[in-house]
Amino acid sequence: MFDLKATIGRLAQGQTLGRQDAWMLFEQMAFGHASHAQLGALLMALRVRGETVEEIVGAALAMRARMVPVKAPADAVDIVGTGGDNAGTYNISTCAAFIVAGAGVPVAKHGNRALSSKSGAADVLSALGVNLDQTPADIERCIAEAGIGFMFAPTHHPALKQLMPVRVDLATRTIFNLLGPLLNPAGVRHHLIGVYSRAWVEPLAHALGDLGSERALVVHGSDGLDEITTVGPTFVSMLARGRVRSFEITPEMVGLVRANPAELKGADGKWNAVALRRVLEGQPGAYRDIALFNAAGGLIAAGVVENWPDAMALARASVDGGAALATLNRLVEASQPEGHVQPY
């Protein structure tokens, strides 16, 4: 029988857990067998000592076994960040997701409301008019009709609901920042994942491989962003054909001018929604450049192109031809309940 108190003691002493022990620990958490005090102690013990790949893989397997699944095409991609970079940018990966979907790649996006920032994916999508109260069948219809669907994390991970107050009270990064991108309810095997620390770029790529992903880019900007950045170099680890290779990319490599960090700042969900829509409408500037760069990464992760110039060209065509904006409008419409009349 799994001993939760003994495991807390082991973690408090700085010991690491194997994959099986991590799986059992997070299964206990998922079944609600840990008090809020125990949850806080576990999360902070892992945070202070530093999580391991084995712990993350074990935890992900436990959480995946309890999630509410969604069916998506085999070539679907997710574009998501861990959060926790404290950069306060606008919703870059959400904007990039519409560009990728506009380029013809199905997107099954998984996300949440803001925990450590002003605007999470759910906040900006809600402000754009997307209905978040959807069943798995509703989301599957959105992917079929609009080319993109959004899975609101609390709906698909009921086991995590009791953790939400603890995470909010802690108000700091925990293992769940790293786990979130690995818990896509559609089981996507293609990913662009931004992480809050360079130290996690390569380990998370290996974790994805251990979890069965086929192709992924894990990225961290040299300016601290959990995105592909236009401020400077981006550190990348790419999973493909069962192997991980690491490299750097820069804005200049794809014909972009470096941005000032202040040019990428955002605000709350409503403000960011306006900014995102303007990018999809074709407005030039730093917001557009970084969205295109991340969309290019998403297209490479999806496997539709192999090099960055071709990926950038495809991303630009998605925006400039109107497909990305049309994708947003279709998602807003497709996500509404039957009988709803969308205002214009």
Curated annotation (Swiss-Prot):
So what EC number does this one have? Answer: 2.4.2.18
Cystine connections: none
Identify the keywords attached in UniProt to this record, alphabetized. Amino-acid biosynthesis, Aromatic amino acid biosynthesis, Glycosyltransferase, Magnesium, Metal-binding, Plasmid, Transferase, Tryptophan biosynthesis
Task: Give the enzyme's main class according to its UniProt record, as a single word.
Answer: transferase
What is the catalytic activity of this protein?
N-(5-phospho-beta-D-ribosyl)anthranilate + diphosphate = 5-phospho-alpha-D-ribose 1-diphosphate + anthranilate
The UniProt entry's sequence similarity note says: Belongs to the anthranilate phosphoribosyltransferase family.
Cross-referenced HAMAP family: TrpD (MF_00211)
Put simply, this protein is called: Anthranilate phosphoribosyltransferase 2
